[in-house]
């Protein structure tokens, strides 16, 4: 709250379209600097993208909700309260698949708002990353009415849009727009969004623009932009050209950035690994290791004595293990945890006899057997025989150590595999147990779509796979 720093508004749920996205429980408010919190509603929003508090009236708050990813409906759109969160009114958005992914406020006029809508839907089979309801909008009356901004912008289906306003010249706006087939462009307006000019074909990449696309304008230099991406892209000329920001000794997958008003060399960046801080405009970075924010997919335990160890695969931070307890006076510390694999870690499994044997995997079933004594990690992923079709591995492929025979493993692609020697060799014990359907023939956004629509193929998980096994 710009009027009271002890008041904090918090939106829950990640604003991305990923298969591993975490959903939220609405909007929370703290009136004591974060010591305690109260849920203020919008529990069906699932993914809050941004919150803005009125600079002169703390009772007025705007909340941008992207809404559920896996289903229609929910509380999606732009919501406004005039009584500090007791009641909410939806002021923008109407489609059952369309939410608001970004909002801005004019620093000179709090009644002037800008909003970006995003139409998207993910199923187990596919991701439709855009649609005709994605776009840019402007309000001159605090969000009560809106005008869609079109002049100079592409008329095709659009995906995720990031918007920024120049602190030096607030009539100047910037927009990073995802277009079809994960292409995109950066646009600039010098007249409050009434007309736009294409500056470049720059768009976030890697797993897809749905995972990034946040755009920021520097408060210290006009036309300096930061576009969130695997590696941050920065422009000094309003989006005409972009270069990669220096990110030595820093994690990738960037999602947010903050600045200090009186320090042009300061950057604070949020990534898939946590928070990084720079005091010299990205020449060097400081990593804050003490935040308990690691996201685990699955966990497993071994039978180590006197304290068993816990192992788990994490989102974009590998697979790790650590003790359940310790007899050290300081208790369990970061240093007690150790990494056993990189990439996205997923399911882990342990050997009930040999506590130094752990199984872990990367995304798409890249299974390893790890010896904790030697540190050796051996790739043991089953492979198809000559002449067989390729294996379809789930993003989070299931691994099972038999409770009856510890050297026996089960692993699954579209078929079930069995090993009798801890993964040194494998035999398939089933055929294809899936329907082997064509994913793009299945309904999404409530109906079937043509092949030329806004499919985000790169961001889709392998389909027609087995997701769990038991014995």
Language-model features: locations:
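Beta-propeller blade termini and top-face loops
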Residues: 1-471
